[in-house]
Amino acid sequence: MLARFPLYLRLVRMDKPIGSLLLLWPTLNALWIASDGRPRWPLLVIFTLGTLLMRSAGCAMNDYADRDFDRHVKRTADRPLTSGKIRAWEAVAIAVGLSFIAFLLILPLNTLTKELSVVALFVAGSYPFMKRFFAIPQAYLGIAFGFGIPMAFAAVQDTVPMLAWVMLVANIFWSVAYDTEYAMVDRDDDIKIGIRTSALTFGRFDVAAVMACYAATLGIYVWIGVTLGFGLAYWAGWAAAVGCALYHYTLIKDRERMPCFAAFRHNNWLGGVLFAGIAVHYLLAGN
């Protein structure tokens, strides 16, 4: 068992934390806004650990769902499940176990948060199979990656205001942007194996679609900033996020694999500076 532990860590992408961060930033945004910049430490711990656990569970389930496809993709052919180093039932067991632990974390929270967690679990568990049916599965991913937003508002306020759903829509656009960049890396392989991705759906308009999704995301955050009366610190973070998006254009405009992958990874900075703007605004407002 111990000898297989490194394989399990690779299965749940513990060696690649970028995915966890892409889930964490919008969740932290929601926690900070819902609590007026003063989130309780227990909630921070619960949502941070829950994000890590559910992302890991999602990776295990994704590899299970894609095991017959991933062997035909150069980037994924050596994953533990695809290469036969671990078995399918192990991946499912890990996904179920991690999801159960994540659910245990939210047991002390209110009923609404627990009810939303059931929806979140369904969305996260069904996403890996959406690539068979949806032309833009990345939009569904945005719901899965962003469901911590309404859950955070529910945990803090015991209600989910319209603002939370607007933030979720922003996250959907952001997810389509960065995961299209990710899909551009595997475009040729995905054509061969018949997987549906936004990069294939957008075709020659893929770069324009990515930038339009960034514009929609950041446009919604303009509305959020104006509606909540955020100050200079927030707008500095927003401007830095705009700079990140423009930098991504320089990486993806030629549609080369490695620059597109670099753009995907760089979204950690885009999410991070947006959160920093929100956090610093509340820090200054409280002094």
Curated annotation (Swiss-Prot):
One of its GO terms (cellular component) is plasma membrane. GO terms for molecular function: 4-hydroxybenzoate polyprenyltransferase activity. One of its GO terms (biological process) is ubiquinone biosynthetic process. It is found in: Cell inner membrane. It catalyses: all-trans-octaprenyl diphosphate + 4-hydroxybenzoate = 4-hydroxy-3-(all-trans-octaprenyl)benzoate + diphosphate. Its EC number is 2.5.1.39. The keyword Membrane applies. The chain crosses the membrane at residues 41-61, 89-109, 133-153, 158-178, 202-224, 266-286. Keywords: Cell inner membrane, Cell membrane, Magnesium, Membrane, Transferase, Transmembrane, Transmembrane helix, Ubiquinone biosynthesis. It is an enzyme of class 2 (transferase). The keyword Cell membrane applies. Its cofactor is Mg(2+). Catalyzes the prenylation of para-hydroxybenzoate (PHB) with an all-trans polyprenyl group. Mediates the second step in the final reaction sequence of ubiquinone-8 (UQ-8) biosynthesis, which is the condensation of the polyisoprenoid side chain with PHB, generating the first membrane-bound Q intermediate 3-octaprenyl-4-hydroxybenzoate. NCBIfam families: ubiA_proteo. This is 4-hydroxybenzoate octaprenyltransferase. It comes from Burkholderia orbicola (strain MC0-3).
